[in-house]
Amino acid sequence: MYSVEDLLISHGYKPARDAAAPCEDKSERCRSTRTGPRAGQGLLNGYKDGATAHTHSRTSLGTGHVSNSENRISRPRGHREHQSTSRTPEARFLNQPSLAWSSQPQSGRDDIYWSRGRQEGSGSLCPRDWKELESRGMAQAYSLPVHVRENLWEVAGRTEHVMKNAIWEEELRMQDMSLESWKKPRELGRQASDGDGRKRPQEKFEGLYPFVHGEHTSQNRKKSQSLPRALSPKSLNFTEIPVPLHDGHITGVPKVPPYPPSFPSPSEPMRNLEKASSSGPFPRPKFGKPLKTPCYSSHSQPRGEGGFQDHQHRDPRGSYPTRSKDPSHELGMLDPGLEPPVYVPPPSYRSPPQHIPNPYLEDPVPRHVSSNQSQQQVPEKPETSCPLPSGSLAARDLYDAMPGSPPQGLPPQPYPIATHGGSIQYIPFDDPRIRHIKLAQPPEFYEEAKLDDTSYNPGLLTTQEPAIGKRQYDDAPSVPRGPTPSPVNEQSSAFVHSSPRWLQGQLPLGIGPGGFHGQTEHHVMGGLTTNVTDIKAEGHASSPQPQSEGTCKTYTKLRKFETGVQSKKSSKKKSNATIFCLVSIPVKSESLVLATDTNNNDFKLVADKTRGLCQGSALQEQSLLSMSSTDLELQALMGSMAWRRTSPRQGLRESEDGQIDDPRILHLIKPKELQASSPWPGHQYRDQQTQTSFHEDSKSSQLLPATKPGEASNVAPTPTCPDTTASEVCLHTALAFSDQNQKPSVPHLQGQTSLSPSRNSAFSRTSSAINQASMSKGTSDQLPGANPVPKPEVVKGESTTGQCNSTQLFGQFLLKPVSRRPWDLISQLESFNKELQEEEESHGGSGSEDSEAEQPEDCADSRTKSWALQGTRTAQQPAGLALENVASPDRRLNDSQSWNEEPKPGHSSVHPQSLGPSQEEGSRGVPVQWADGSLTAEQKSQEDLNGMCERDFSPRPVSRIAPIDTKAAPLYCLSEPRGSQELTKFGDAVGSVQLGRETPTQVGNGGDTEVLPCVLLPLADKYRGHSTPDFRSLELTLGQEQNAYKLECLDLENTVEVLPSESLQERAERILGIEVAVESLLPSARRTEQSQLPEPDASACNPSSSREDSSHSLALPVGPKVATDAFYGRRKCGWTESPLFVGERAPQASICSDVDGFPTSQATSPEPGKKDEEAKAPFKSTLFHFMEKSTNVVGPEKRLRNPSKVVENLQEKLVSPPKKADSVHLIRMREVNSLSQMRCLSSKSADSVEEPDPLKVIKSSAWLSEGLTSLGGKDEAWQAGHLPSVSQNENGHPEVPRDKMSDQDLWCADSYDPSRVERV
């Protein structure tokens, strides 16, 4: 764009760019230099000489000016003549400028030439040409021939490209070319100069008259023209902008009518600017001799202004009032930007920033400045020309300077975006709504914008946006790329692509980049509409409902919900430089608003679902919704792109209804993301980690109502409804945790809440994890519980409300950080997860029946488990578990449901209990299982196998296996929420599947084996982090089968079934592909001891008691554990992992080592992968061991204490770091992400002090792969061998097998104890 010569010129050198250019530049520049003294106006590149020469050239050339305006002053100027002479190539320039105008490439060169010529001959060309060009631009505008206008139009197009030199040079060149077109007979350069001199001195200098009106005379101009030229350049900068604007006839557009209204604005500013800032007196005093560069600067920046002003000025001499108007704008722009600071940068540099965006700026500028562009973009121009002049010139310049506004077919959109001068007008998406949405009325406008967005259309955008959109786009400089895309989808996509906005931390942060785009991409119209809505809600954090809507929905669809869709389209970002979107996402009133709006959103979502939108979509959205404020923040911070990734999956999975739902959900969700990024309000909320809890509370509120109604709706009044809806409701119940709230919202959330949380893995992991835990238990309660324990589900909602609410609060805190950093990967995983969830949702309908058996404990446990499942599923889903189990957190409900369903045939009650317990806690499931013992366990095992295998083989069993996998996944989720989480979860799922596959072997063991999976599953379900091992143990047989299945589905090497005899080290090495020190795996022994303690404790508790203890540990700690588990998962997910996971994990790690060791041993210890699971499973295992050990009292207390501590620590850490600073938060998120991933890997080692980092990684990997393979193989073998023992352990002889399991589990817990890692 800028040649060396341009740079030299900009720096004051007069490069001989062309033979003519050097000639003119030289002659002009030299004249500037040598004529500078002569004119005494060397300020302007020999400006005086320029004035004199230009006076002559203009007089002679101007005489021939076709344009009377330029001819009227007939500014023949020797200099201009000289310029023409020196620019004899300038004749080429003029001629070629025509070509250059016609061809942007030439324009670039010509622009450079002009820039150089102007800068070189700035004295003559700069002031005179600027004036000339201004006058000529104006004269051309109203008096130039159409071809000249077209040339100007061409210049406009080309200037858009080479806005920098192109714009102001084009202005000069446009004048020259226009004059050339007019006065082709005349010397091209001189003609342009002359005509310009005539008209421009007359008009422009009249406009600048205070300084140069008398000087407009050729001699008067000589002296004053240098000054006016100095002004002129500044004015011309803007004038140039309009001239080249996409209006071939910028100068020739509505010559007088638009110019007087619009151009006069720049003209007057040019006048005033020229007088005030650019005027010979001002610029001269300002810049003195440096005026040369200021001339360049004027040429570059003021050039656009001056171009505008000049065109306006030249055209409407009597439009001085407008000039007066524009001067403030232009002057504000010019003085700040065109003055020494702006001038300091060479005009070349200066101009391009303006000019590059100027194509858009030009668009708005002409819009403002003149209708010349009105012809081009009449709708935009008028509006833009109206608003832009007043505040947009600065924004305009910003547009110019900010080529950020994409030079896409929709300049109006870019203008508003680029015009960030307004500030927080986050209208990055669509011009229409941008136009509708003003800073003053973002909520209504965003609402309207949503409507308008629905009816988005470049024309509409152009027409509506110009005034508002321009400014709002100015406010959101990043927005340009978003709004630039004419298509809504593309706009949204562009906004998602403008994830830099998030990165910029600008309002656009969350707006388009994060979720809007994905959703928009989801459904162009919906996305755009949603984008508008999100902006509306986010744009004005003060608007609670839109915000809460946005918070609930934005989040649902904005970050996480849009993770897949947005990721695809945006990855954008999110990209996903989702650095700070999430800060904005949480709305202050979100908790309150979320309660209502969330309910409303839930209602809407439910309505959408009811409308036939996939429940998965709604669930996804809801889970995103739940996660919206906190997790969305976090993901906006770190995982916007991940969310987008998830969103595309979500969009893919729920594209049918998701896209249908997306508009609503998006518009509901978008505000949140907008809030996250849109206000830099996001910055307001970014600090508000409380909003994380807020959001979780909001989620609680929204999901709570949703959950209860879901129970009521799904379960009818009772939670007995079902399946997907019940699960969804349960999810929301988990989120809501409030009997009252749950009931109201559930109907709406039925199809969407559970699905939404299920889907939004990130949220599921964090806030949604709790929600899903609650939902899982709610769903479990709902399905079977509806029959046996409908109330408990409600009770669960209520009793767990306190626990879960606390958890939710902390989870919210956690959610923010946890979801933020870790959720980048988690979001990505969730994209996959959601897809799987979508698949699973087919089977997940009845996933919550089984949970209901243990609604009371399911309350807590299901919450925990549900959350774990959710996290696991979400984590696992991304892991690539094609199994439906991962597909949806609902799957975890489906898991319990599947089990419930599977057991249902045999023991509808028992299995729901046993499955529910297995899923939620052994309390009920264990007693049932142990009471039902063989049958339940057997059937459960069968059903586990069936469910897992079916899940593996048949959708329903797959659904069921998915929950198991999901439960296994929570270990990973907790342990390794990051990149490894996919594999980890997948490995966990696969390992679980492998275990499950071996479960048939265990099934051969009869009830014990089956019971163990049942117990394990409940433990896994209950202890998201801890149960995974149990889950795996439970799922060993199925794990094997499913391992193959998942291998098929996920093509994971890790899925390869591992020989049961394969040693942990071998498995770890095989999975990790690296040598794993046995010592790193040795924590197994240590864990064995630890586990033995809890296991005897569990044994002492008695099979049912131990299991029930585990259940109670989960049930009791459910609140804590939900908190802890949720926290643990959150922590694991990343945010809590490093800060929270450490503090709470340490105490829990001990218990986890004891308690966790056993369950982990069951499922995880056999495999190093399991160890990493242990990293996540340690918590689970800890819970499990709590359960197992009769640490029901100790464990729950400790767990309660730990969760409290964890929550406190989390809150402190989450509240503290996020509140510290967004950047700090973002850094922290990234740090946490890295640390979480590393800790997920290293937490294995950190968990067991003896475990080395390589083992951490190995265990992490082994936990991923081995979790899949080892779990399938060694755990399989171990469980195959010990499952009966473990089953007995569960059934009554948990000590030995559990000890065995504990050995492995303990080492696993130690090796992978996230708390230890976190503590580290």
Curated annotation (Swiss-Prot):
Q: Cite the record's Basic and acidic residues compositional bias ranges.
A: 108-119, 308-329, 1292-1303
Region ranges (Disordered): 1-124, 183-202, 209-233, 252-426, 452-492, 676-720, 741-802, 835-942, 1085-1116, 1153-1174, 1275-1320
- What keywords does the record list, in alphabetical order? Cell adhesion, Cell junction, Phosphoprotein
Superkingdom of the source species: Eukaryota
The record's GO CC annotations read: adherens junction; cell junction; cell-cell junction; perinuclear region of cytoplasm; ruffle membrane
Disulfide connectivity for this sequence is: none
Skewed-composition ranges (Polar residues):
58-71, 95-107, 369-378, 454-465, 741-782, 865-877
Biased composition range(s): Acidic residues? 849-859
* Compartments where found: Cell junction, Adherens junction
Q: Cite the record's Pro residues compositional bias ranges.
A: 255-267, 338-356, 404-415
Main location per the UniProt record: other
Residues modified to Phosphoserine:
486, 851, 1027, 1033, 1245, 1248
InterPro entries referenced in this protein's UniProt entry, alphabetically = JCAD
Under PANTHER family, the record lists: JUNCTIONAL CADHERIN 5-ASSOCIATED PROTEIN (PTHR34757:SF1), JUNCTIONAL PROTEIN ASSOCIATED WITH CORONARY ARTERY DISEASE (PTHR34757)
Q: What is this protein called?
A: Junctional cadherin 5-associated protein
**What is the species listed in this Swiss-Prot or TrEMBL entry?**
Mus musculus
Q: What is the lineage of its organism?
A: Eukaryota, Metazoa, Chordata, Craniata, Vertebrata
